[in-house]
Amino acid sequence: MVSKKQKFLTVILVIVLAIVIVGGVFGISFVKGRVTFPWQLQNSEAKTEQVKEPAKEEPKLVIKEKKQDESAKKEQELKKAKEEAEAAVEKETEKTEEEPVDNLLNDMKLKYYGKLAVEGSHLVDADGHEVLLMGVSTHGINWYPEYASAETIKSLRDTWGINVIRLAMYTSDYNGYCVAGKENQEKLKDIIDDAVEAATDNDMYVIIDWHTLNDADPNEYKADAIQFFGEMVRKYKDNENVIYEICNEPNGDTTWNDVRRYANEVIPVIRNVDAIILVGTPKWATDLDSVLDKPLDFDNIMYTYHFYAGTHHKAERNALRDALDEGLPVFISEYGLVDADGDGNLNEKEADYWYDMIRKEYGVSSCMWNLSNKDEGSAMINADCDKLSDFTEEDLSESAMWLIDQISQLKHSDLEQGVDWITPENNNR
């Protein structure tokens, strides 16, 4: 039987053991942090906030640093791209200066339409569609035969895109056809023959121009003209691209009646073939009023009008406009952007007015004066250039570059469809 004392000691021992066990458990939990005691709660929350706050800030710092790195990288890439672009532009500029001007035209060429005719006031193709001839006039082939060469004609067709060239053969000036003997006549005809062949090979029209000038009245050498054009027609009867200009610029006291009398005798010789014939008008090819009063009674006839932008302005444009509105068929076989004497500075403002009128308003065909390297404002080749082809910008005058620019502005559809380039413009200029 257990005594009271033993029972008491046993209870005491159990209590001590319980205290030891519970204390051990709490001690271990406290050290490992698995149990949170009430007195630990406030401190634990504070520590949690301290831990959480850096967790919010650290991603921001990382993102900001990343953005800065990306921004710096983009700036480097942009700088590199800009340097490469500038280098490319500089290289292309050098290339443009060295290469022929065909790059300016993107290889566009004015259309060749085949056989032409005159209907009303318009030059048309075989289907009756209006056409546009744009090109150049040589200076006198008596002085500058080299620019009527096959090399030059092919180059201008390929690089400038023109579709007509006018061969200015002077009749009474230096080495003129009518004043320098038979041998000279044969040389001039050989030049024409080579040029006609080159134009034909390159799908171009060619104007054979009986270039009267100091012989103010074309009747002075009428017999020579009849003989010459008779020979030309027999030689080129099968060339539908040949156009005949029977006199250049009647001047002085020459009247339209004088020109009319001359034309009535020369035209029948050419009319043996149904070619286009251009007839010069009085007062240096500016008097269309006289023609309106008494036009010629032939088919496929056009009347020439000449202007120089430095000399001829609004009054002359109005005179041409009146004639065109009356239905007179006009061909501008010679024009320049400088003064009427062929020299002086380019008058670009007036030139643009003229061009807008003759091309956009009326679609009048034209040839710019002059294809040579003569030291004067109207020459298209610079005086220090002796090349005959593959001209660069440095080789060309302002007049030539203006013409190339005008051709380059024509739309592709304009070149192929003919009438789309006729756009009414403001007439008050």
UniProtKB/Swiss-Prot annotation:
Write down the EC number.
3.2.1.4
Q: Does the keyword Hydrolase apply?
A: yes
Q: What is this protein called?
A: Endoglucanase A
Any idea which UniProt keywords this protein has?
Carbohydrate metabolism, Cellulose degradation, Glycosidase, Hydrolase, Polysaccharide degradation, Signal
Catalysed reactions, semicolon-separated = Endohydrolysis of (1->4)-beta-D-glucosidic linkages in cellulose, lichenin and cereal beta-D-glucans
Molecular function in Gene Ontology: cellulase activity
Disulfide bond sites: none
Q: Which residues form the signal peptide?
A: 1-34
Q: Where is this region: Disordered?
A: 46-100
A Gene Ontology annotation in the biological process aspect, one of them, is:
cellulose catabolic process
Q: Which gene encodes it?
A: celA
Q: Which family does it belong to?
A: Belongs to the glycosyl hydrolase 5 (cellulase A) family.
- What ranges does the record list as Basic and acidic residues composition bias? 46-94
Q: Which domain of life is it from?
A: Bacteria
Give the annotated active site.
249, 334
Please tell me whether the keyword Hydrolase is annotated for this protein.
yes
Organism per entry: Butyrivibrio fibrisolvens
PANTHER family per the UniProt record, alphabetical: ENDO-BETA-1,4-GLUCANASE A, GLYCOSIDE HYDROLASE FAMILY 5 DOMAIN-CONTAINING PROTEIN
